[in-house]
Curated annotation (Swiss-Prot):
Belongs to the FAM149 family. It comes from the Eukaryota. Pfam families: DUF3719 (PF12516). GO terms for biological process: cilium assembly; protein localization to cilium. It is found in: Cell projection, Cilium. Residues 332-341, 428-446, 461-471 have a biased composition (Polar residues). Residues 314-344, 356-379, 391-482 are annotated as: Disordered. This is Primary cilium assembly protein FAM149B1. Its main location: other. Involved in the localization of proteins to the cilium and cilium assembly. Indirectly regulates the signaling functions of the cilium, being required for normal SHH/smoothened signaling and proper development. Keywords: Cell projection, Cilium, Cilium biogenesis/degradation. The lineage of its organism: Eukaryota, Metazoa, Chordata, Craniata, Vertebrata. Interacts with TBC1D32; may play a role in cilium assembly. PANTHER family: AGAP003710-PA (PTHR31997), PRIMARY CILIUM ASSEMBLY PROTEIN FAM149B1 (PTHR31997:SF0).
Length: 482
């Protein structure tokens, strides 16, 4: 600690001697070498002058920053021109107090108003905490061009600094405001030109425009946001959307294998979809009437059978989502199209193993492919008789249990014979299968019918029919009404 204190005192005494030599011209033992060095500097650089005095160190929080040394030296040359000598190292200045450091000295006031203006413009006094932030406007660069502001502006743009000074910030704000107004007017003019150019090549057919606006099922119009005021669409763009109906159908979702089916009349698809929606809504209204396993689509519509077959494949994905959720109550049979009739054994018990899924049955289509909604067209009487044979074989299957069909036989004993012919095939709208091939019926019924034949109940249904047809592999004989 004593060594540090002694070293500090020696350094402090050295700086004090230097200050006395520079500002008070008091020689001492410690400043002899400094005097020799100053003489060498004065002889080598006769134009070098040291003016002013350091008031306080910059670490105290404030200090004086001269803008340009040339302006300060010029002001002092006007004050003391007679004391300047080329061979003498001159030090000129006055000792000021800290309280009045920011005020001008009396000698400075007597020098004239011009010198006061220059010193006030050239010296900046700052007090307080100085942040490390540099802001400059390159005023010296602008003064160097002598009034040529365009060249100075190009030089500033090359530097890449943002506008920092308040003047340039206001300038940028004004330019941005002017640009916004001009750009809004330009966009308005361009919008009018675009609309006029669009309407010039548009077609006069307004129905095509309505098709493109109202066709919500089109894959090309799903993600487009239509403006409030839409100009007329040209005929070429409308035809590009509606010209290829097969691509229009394939893009709507995954379609099953439709080899062997006759598909025609695809432009009628929107009408058929609306018809199927009405049928499904009618089914949903009748959910609160339990005790039946009939479907409203079992009615015979010979004129619309082909139309329904064209839309059944494309409607599979939509109907599956509405039919496959939780099991629902079965529908009634006694509708406006039903009539009274004798009971049938197939209405009482339906037993048998679960048939394969839709994807398995669709892989191998057959001529007897049948949908659950009676979507295939009626072909002839022979096929109806064949369906009756298949229907008479299914009640004898021993496996599984179907409470839906049992409830239908108990609650609704009087049914129409024509509806009972297709009841075993189309009476389960909530199951997973949608197409039941002929080979599966034959293989499952031929092995189980001989062991579980019921003559008492099997003779009740066929007595009301006219024509008979024997079965190919053995089993009960079914009759149909013509």
């Amino acid at each position: 600690m004593e060594l540090d204190q002694n070293a500090t005192e020696k350094v402090k005494a050295m700086f004090t001697a230097i200050d006395e030599l520079l500002y008070e011209q008091k020689p001492s033992v410690h400043t002899q070498s400094l005097q020799k060095e100053c003489q060498q500097w004065a002889s080598s650089f006769p134009h070098l002058r040291i003016l002013g005095r350091q008031i306080i160190t910059s670490s105290e929080g404030y200090g004086l920053y001269p803008r340009s040394p040339s302006a300060v030296s010029a002001s002092h040359e006007a004050i003391l021109p007679q004391e300047r000598e080329s061979t003498i190292f001159g030090i000129r200045g006055k000792k000021l107090h800290f309280s009045s450091s920011y005020k001008a000295s009396p000698s400075t006031k007597a020098s004239g108003s011009s010198a006061d203006g220059e010193e006030a413009d050239c010296i900046i006094f700052s007090e307080g905490i100085i942040e490390e932030y540099l802001a400059f406007d390159h005023t010296d660069m602008e003064e160097g061009f002598h009034g040529n502001k365009s060249e100075a502006a190009t030089e500033k743009q090359k530097l890449g600094y943002p506008p920092i000074a308040p003047f340039y910030c206001m300038k940028e704000d004004v330019l941005a405001y002017v640009f916004d107004n001009v750009w809004s007017k330009a966009v308005g003019c361009m919008e009018q030109l675009t609309r006029s150019h669009w309407e010039g090549f548009a077609s006069d057919d307004e129905s095509n425009v309505e098709i493109t606006r109202l066709d919500s099922g089109s894959p090309y119009m799903l993600n487009e946001q239509q403006p409030l005021v839409l100009p007329r669409v040209p005929q070429s763009k409308v035809m590009s959307v509606t010209s290829n109906p097969m691509n229009f159908c394939q893009a709507s979702g995954h379609q099953p294998n439709v080899n062997g089916l006759l598909i025609h009349g695809m432009p009628l698809q929107p009408r058929n979809l609306s018809l199927m929606d009405k049928l499904l809504d009618l089914d949903d209204k009748l959910l609160m009437r339990p005790g039946s396993s009939s479907v409203l689509s079992n009615r015979n519509w010979p004129n619309r059978a082909m139309e329904l077959s064209t839309s059944s494949l494309s409607y599979t994905t939509q109907s599956a989502r509405r039919r496959n959720p939780p099991p629902r109550t079965l529908h009634p049979i006694s509708t406006s199209h039903s009539r009274t009739g004798t009971p049938w054994p197939a209405e009482e018990i339906l037993r048998g193993p679960r048939l394969p899924m839709t994807a398995d049955s669709l892989s191998s289509p057959s001529p007897m492919t049948m949908g659950r909604n009676n979507l295939l067209p009626p072909i002839g009487t022979a096929d109806v008789e064949h369906l009756s044979i298949l229907g008479s074989q299914r009640p004898t299957k021993p496996h599984g249990d179907s409470s839906r069909a049992r409830s239908a036989a108990v609650d609704e004993p009087n049914q129409q014979p024509q509806e009972r012919l297709l009841l075993p095939v189309f009476s389960r709208p909530n199951t997973t299968q949608s197409f039941l091939p002929e080979t599966q019926y034959r293989s499952s019924c031929a092995s189980e019918c001989p062991h579980h034949a019921r003559p008492g109940r099997g003779s009740a249904g066929p007595q009301s029919h006219g024509s008979t047809k024997p079965q190919s592999r053995g089993g009960p004989i079914s009759r149909t009404r013509q």
